Amino acid sequence: MFRLSIALIFLTTFILHSQQKEPPALDPSFHKERRQMVLEQLPPNSISVIFSAPIRNRANDVDHPYHQNPNFYYLTGFLEAHAALVLLGTPMNVEGSPVQEILFVRDQDPYYALWEGDIKGPKATQKEYAIDKVLSTTKFKSFLSSLQGINNINHFPFFDDVRDHPRNENDLFSLLTAFKGFISAQSELSKPEDNSLTIDQEYLPDVVGSLREIKTAKEIEILKQAVAMSAIGQVEVMKAIHPNMSERELQGIHEFIFKKYGAKHVGYPSIVGAGAHGCVLHYTANTADQVGNQLVLMDVGAEFQNYTADVTRTIPANGKFTKEQAEIYNLVLAAQNAGIEASVVGASFSDPHRVARSIIQQGLIDLGIIESEKEVRTYFPHGTSHYIGLDVHDPGTYGPLRANS
C-alpha cells in the first residue's frame, strides 16, 4: 500500500515540479459568468447583496489573517475586506449607465497603505475585475436610499462577529448597518396586507450553493493541485515519522510542504492525532509531545488559490501495523474503495455512505467488536463524504450526484 502511494506521489511531485510557475487563478470572466448565472435567477425589481467577510480578531490589536467570504469571492474574485456586491433583478441607471451589478469597495488610503498595504480602490478594481460598476463604499448608503420599486430583498444570513472600526466610517460594520436600515425602511413602506415586500435570506444561499456544487474544468484543476500537495505532505510524513516525534512536528512537515508547493494557507486547522487523539473527529490541539508506537491519524488539506483539499491518512508511527491495527485499517480501506465505486453520476448523495457503512458494520461484527448493527454508530458516528471547493465542506444540493460535483 505504501509503495503504491509513493509511486503515485512521485508522479504528482513531477507534475508540480514541471510547472515553471504557479498556474493563473480564476480570471475575471469566470466570476462574471457566475454573477450572470445568479442574475438570471433573480426576480424583477429585486436587490441581492453579498458582503465580504469580516476581519476577525485574534487578541487585543492582533487580527487573524484575512480570509475572504467564499461566496463573495466566487462572485467577484475580490479578496479585500469592507466590500459589498449588489445584484439587481432589473437594470438600474447608475451614474449614467444601466447596470445590474455594482461592487462597493474602499477608496485608496495612504495611512492604511503604510501599515497594512495598498488597497485597490474603485478605479483599479473596475479595470481589473470586469464588473459593470465599481463605486466607493462612501456611496453605498445613498445608493440604497435612491432605490425605488424594490419588492424583493435577498441576502445571506448576517455575520454575527462584525466589529465597528471607529476610524473607518465606511467599514463592513457601516455597510451592514446601512443595509439593515434599508430593510427596515422598506418594511415600513410596504403594506402587510398586500404582501408587497419579500425579504429572504435562504434563496440566495440556495442559488449560489447549487452553482458552487458543479465545478468548472479550471476549478477541478486547482483542486487537483491542492490535493496533490496535500498528498505529498502525507508521504513526507511517512518517510520522516518516528515514535519520539510530536504531533506538532508532523503538522509542521505537512504545512511546510503546502507552502513549498505554493499554498498560502491551510484549508482548515490541521488534525494530527496519535492514539486516542485520532478518535476525536475535529482534534486540532496537536499537543502530544511524543506520538509513541501508536497509529497517527492526519486529516489535513492545503488551500491553493482559495480552494481546499481534504486528505486523511492513518499510519503506524513505528512503520509497522500490528495484526489488530492492520485488520481495522484494511476494513476502513475496503469501505473507502466501495464508497468511491458508488460515487457515480445519478446515484444518491447518500449511496456511498450506505455502502461504506454497511462494510464497516459487517466488518466490526466479524471482528467481534460489536454484536448488532445498531452499535456501529459508536464507531462510525458521521457521514462518509462531502463536497470540497472554496470551503472544505462545500455547499451543494446533496441530492443525486451530478457530473463535476
Can you annotate each of these PLM segments?
Residues 19-405:
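Active-site neighborhoods and metal-handling regions in enzymes and metal-associated proteins
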Residues 10-17:
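Hydrophobic h-region of N-terminal signal peptides that target proteins for export
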Residues 8-10, 377:
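Residue-level detector of alpha-helix boundary/anchor positions
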Residues 1-8:
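Sec-dependent signal peptide recognition
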